[in-house]
Amino acid sequence: MAKIKLKNRKALVVYNKTDFDKNKHFAQALVDELNKKKLVGHILLLDDETADHKHIKNVELIINRSRRIDFLTKHNFLNSFLINPQNIVLVANDKYETYRWLKQHKFLTVDTTIFDPKKIKTFPIVIKKRDSYGGEDVHLIQNAEEIKQLPIQNPNEWIVQPFLSIGKVEYRAYILFGKVLKTIRRTASGDDFRANYSQNAAVDLFKLKWYIKHKIKRIAKKLGHGYYAIDFFLNKYNRIVVNEIEDAAGARALTKMCPDLNLPRVIIKSSLTHFKHHLKRQMIP
């Protein structure tokens, strides 16, 4: 079989404009690493009408950081090698679908229901928008009166979870093609219950015990290959309680804790290895 050549193959790093504005340097670093390997890499902003879309024709590799998949069918990218695959994007960007997927595969997670104020009997609770991320649209509710203050127009777009005291400390495992790259621990700041780096949570590196790492890898194996993060709590029995899956996982906290880690280079190196396998499979008659 002929050697797979990467030179001049087209690649896209896809973002929505809001995430791109927060992660410009990281996005450009991914493109730079692609170009160093002789691919032709470009950034595509999905919701920017001024963006130049001339580079999307005949794209073979797509690193999707947009939290969306609708553009795939629109531009006929269905035969391209996609990071992350559609199933990961769908599960990660709808918190109720995250819950359903985890329950289906018998992984421990936080009880989750679609918002219905008539069924809420106990407090405190956490109410989140299904497509929220970064700690936005997440509310700690102490009583029924506080529910009335929430900006909820469509109840089906929101979920309800019990408030967990362990939730002020959350762990994030960065997954790269089935391997646990690094894990960080995030501790909520002061009276805030959200353990998000973007909400000023304290961050430190965390070394996983072997059995916790094994469980994380089991989840990743079921979910599929790509680059994403699994956010979880540890209960009093030191068991994983999965909270969320983040397919466009931010790298700022990890970069802060690991200044010598060239994350874009690591991601592209691993991605190109799997991209080559994809190309070889396409060559097999």
UniProtKB/Swiss-Prot annotation:
GO biological process terms, semicolon-separated: SOS response
SUPFAM superfamilies, per the entry: Glutathione synthetase ATP-binding domain-like
Protein name according to UniProt: Uncharacterized protein MG011 homolog
Domain ATP-grasp: 107-285
PROSITE patterns named among the record's database cross-references: ATP_GRASP
Domain of life assignment: Bacteria
GO cellular component: cytoplasm
GO MF term list: ATP binding; metal ion binding; ribosomal S6-glutamic acid ligase activity
